[in-house]
Amino acid sequence: MTTLKLRLNLPSNQAEQVERVQVAVKRKQAATETMEEAWARILAMKNSDTDRQRLLEVKRAMEAGKIGRSPADAGKRFSKAEALRLWRQLAELERERKIAELVAKTPGNYRLITNEAQFESLLEALKNEPMIALDTETTGVDVYEDKIVGISLTLPRADLHVYIPIRHDQGEQLAPDYVLDGLKPVLEDDAIGKVLHNAVFDIHMLMSHGINVAGLRWDTQTAMSLLNENEESFALKDLATKYLREPSDTFETLFGKDAKFNTIPLDVALVYAAKDTHLTWRLYEFQRHHLSKMPTILKYYEEVEVPLLYAVVDMERTGFLIDVEYAKQYGEEMRRDIEAREKALKEKLGDINLNSPAQLKPALERIVGRKLESTDAKKVLKPLKSQFPVIAELLEYKELVKLHSTYISVLPELIHPKTGRLHARFNPMGARTGRFSSGGNGVNLQNQPKSARKLFVAPPGWVILGGDFSQQEIRCAAYFTQEPALLEAYEKGKDVYATMAADFYGKPYEECGDGTPERKAMKIGVLASLYGTGPTTLSQQLGCSVEEAKEFLDQFFAKYSRVKRWIDETKAFCQRHGFVWMDKQQRKRRLPEAKKRPKNWEERGEVARALRQGPNAVIQGTSAIQTKTTLVKLHELCKRKGWKLLGTIHDEVLLLVPETITREDVAEFERVMLESYRFGNVPNKTDIEIMRRWGEGYSVDEWFANKQKEESA
C-alpha cells in the first residue's frame, strides 16, 4: 500500500495558528515535567557558586514546605529565573524570621529610652560608671552631612544596655537636642572611660553634633590589630562571631542593602543597637584579658594607639583646601600637552589606540625588532626606554594621562560641598606592619604625585608647616644592625648613601653626592638588602643584568656583615616563633607561614616570602611606631598653640599654622620631631619646609629671610 504524502500550502494566518498549537503542546509537555526532573535540569546548568548555593537553598525550602510556586507560574515550566526569584522571597522570609526572633529574645537588660523619666534615670546611673561602651546609629557614613538617628550605651556596673532613639521615622522618642544636651557632660567627661568599635567614626559624628568625646580608653577595632593583624575582617559582627561565639548578623543581612536605620521599628532597633555596645564591651574584656599577658604591647596601645585616634579625627576634619582655579588652568595645559604627545607618538607608531595593549604591542615589537611579553610599563617597557627613545616618550605620555585622569581632573570633584575641603581618611592600621594608609572619599594622599600636590594650598592667613623623618627606615636599620658604616655616617651628620657609596665603590665622598649614579645605586641597594629583594627585581631597579645585581648583593653583604648578621638572626627568630618583634616588644608582626615545613614548591615559596617579610616588618613597624608616637606629641603641641594637624604621608607630617609663625615656633616643632621617639644611639633628623602650596616649600631660613624683606619693603 502506498503512503500518500500531502503538502499543504496554508495561508500565513493558518500557519501561525499551527505554530501556536505546537508551542502550546510543548508547554503542556513541559508542564508535566516533575519538580525532581526540573531541579536535575537546573542544577546541571553552568551555575556560579553563588547561584548554585541559592538554588540548593530554594530546593530544600520547597521540599520542606517553607516556600512554593505562585499560582501564576504553576502552569509554566520551572526555570532557573523563577528559582532565583523564589530565593529572594526566601531571603526576605528569613530576614523577617530572624528579626522576629531577635525581638522575641530581647534580653531583659536591654532598655529603650523614650521618655524624660527614663532618660533622667539613665543620666543618674551613668554617674556611677567608671567606663561605658558607646555607639551611634546614623542616616549614613558622611560624618559632615549625615545625622545621628540614635545612641546606644552599655553600663557595665548597672548591667544595662540602652538605646536612645532620636530621629526614627516612627515611634515615641525624645527630641535630639534634649538627648544630646543631656549626654554632652557625660561624653565630654574624661573621667568616664569610653569603649568604642571604630571610634574615629563615632567621634566624628558626635563632633558634628556639638559633642567632643573625651575619655577614649579603648577601640576594639584597632586593639584587634595588635592581637592579630592577619584577621580577615575587623568588623564587630565578624569578631564577635569568631571570638565571643556570638553569631551576629550584619545590618545588610537583617535589613537589606539600601535600608536606613531611621526606618527601623524601635523594638527592632533596640535589640540591634544595644547588642552592638554589649558586644563591644564583651570584646573589650576579651581583648584586655589577652593583652594584659603582653604588658609591653598593652602599654604601647594605651599610650600611643588610643590617643592617636584623636589626632586622626583632627587630621581628617581639618581637610585640604584645593585651588580649583589652578586645577582648571593646569588641567587644560596638561590636556593640550597630552594631545600633542599623542599626535607625535602616532606619527612614529602608527594610527593606533595608545591605550590598547592589543594595538600597542605589535607596534612596539616593530620598533624593538622582537616579540614582547606584554606592554607592562614596569616589567617590560622601563628596561627598554634607554635604548628606544619612543618608549621613553610613551612612558612619559602614559604618566601624564594617569596624572590628569586620576588626580588633576578628579581632585576638585572630591571637595565636600558642606565644608569646602577635601577630606582624606587616615587608617593607622592600614598596613599589617602598623603603617598608616590613606584612602576613602576617593582620595589616597600616599600616592599623590608632586605635580598633583600643587593643588593643595593653605587657607588665607595660614601656611603649611611640613617636616619629614629623614631617612627614617635606614636610621632604624642602623639602630638594629649597629653597622659601623651607618652609625659613623649619622654621627658625623653625613649623607649615609653618599658615605656608603664612597666606601663601596672606592671613590671620594664628594664624587658620590646627590644625583650621582653611585649614590642612587647604593640607596636602591641598601633598601633592597633590608627588604629581601632578589637579584631579578634588583636588576630591574638598577637597570643592570641579573648577574650584576647578584654580585652587588654579594659584595654588599660581605662588606656590611652586621647588616647580614641581623637579617639572618631576624629570619631565624621568625622561623622558630612565627613572628617578629618591633622595637622594645611594642608590637608583633605575625608570620605563621615562616614556621611551616614545606612539602612542595608552593609551600617553599610561602615560607621564603614570610622569612623575607620578617626583617622588613621590623624596620617598617618600628618606623611606624616612631611616626605615631611623634604624631601624638604633635597633636598635643597643636592644641597648645592653636595649630591644626593636616596629614601624614609616608615619612612626612603636615601641619596648618598661622602665617605669623616665629622661628621659636618652628624650633618647638623641630624638637617634637627629633625627640619624641629615638632609635637608640642613632640621631634623628628632620627637614622642615614652610609652604603656601604643598610641594612648593621654603627652608626655614629662606622663609624668614623673605618675611624680613617683605616687612622692610
List where the protein language model places each region:
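Active-site-proximal helix-loop-helix substrate-binding element of RNase H-like nuclease domains
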Residues: 6-13, 28, 39, 43-46, ...
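Non-catalytic nucleic-acid-binding interfaces of large nucleic-acid enzymes and RNP effectors
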Residues: 2-88, 162, 230, 337-463, ...
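Catalytic palm active-site di-aspartate
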Residues: 219, 276, 280, 308-317, ...
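Catalytic palm subdomain of template-directed nucleic-acid polymerases
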Residues: 226-229, 313-338, 477, 534-547, ...
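Core structural elements
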Residues: 198, 248-249, 272-288, 295-321, ...
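A common structural junction motif
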Residues: 560, 671-681
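Acidic, glycine-rich two-metal-ion catalytic cores of nucleic acid-processing enzymes
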Residues: 90-94, 105-113, 128, 133-142, ...
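Mixed-charge, glycine-rich, non-catalytic linkers/tails in nucleic-acid processing enzymes
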Residues: 214-215, 242, 249-353, 481-491
